[in-house]
Amino acid sequence: MIVGIGIDIIELNRIEKMLDGKLKFMERILTENERNVAKGLKGSRLTEFVAGRFAAKEAYSKAVGTGIGKEVSFLDIEVRNDDRGKPILITSTEHIVHLSISHSKEFAVAQVVLESSSS
């Protein structure tokens, strides 16, 4: 049973501007593992990576119903890729999490669906 749905869209140029103060912004948004992946990226690929993670974390917080804040922070949520490259969301939840991230020339968007883990 679906227990939550969240979606977020972010302008890539907004993230690009925030990356000017790169380290501080990335430390606030990305987990250590995500920052390690980001170190190998440059230019538009780095912007897309960070924007996708930002949107995914915002979408998750909306699906949970709290938004980013006291109950859920950016660092409580990690986005990884499975063996086929599919994004997966790692967090301390009892729910099954479905995540989709997409990019265009100007935007990154993410959608999260939370499913009850009990039948």
From Swiss-Prot:
Record's keyword annotation contains Transferase: yes
Catalytic function, reaction form: apo-[ACP] + CoA = holo-[ACP] + adenosine 3',5'-bisphosphate + H(+)
EC number: 2.7.8.7
Subcellular compartments: Cytoplasm
Chain positions recorded as Mg(2+) binding sites: D8, E58
GO molecular function: holo-[acyl-carrier-protein] synthase activity; magnesium ion binding
GO annotation terms (biological process): fatty acid biosynthetic process; lysine biosynthetic process via aminoadipic acid
Keywords: Cytoplasm, Fatty acid biosynthesis, Fatty acid metabolism, Lipid biosynthesis, Lipid metabolism, Magnesium, Metal-binding, Transferase
Annotated GO CC locations: cytosol
Gene3D superfamilies reported in the protein's UniProt record: 4'-phosphopantetheinyl transferase domain
Keyword Phosphoprotein: no
Annotated family: Belongs to the P-Pant transferase superfamily. AcpS family.
NCBIfam families assigned to the protein according to its UniProt record, in alphabetical order: acpS, pantethn_trn
Protein name: Holo-[acyl-carrier-protein] synthase
Native source organism of the sequence: Bacillus anthracis
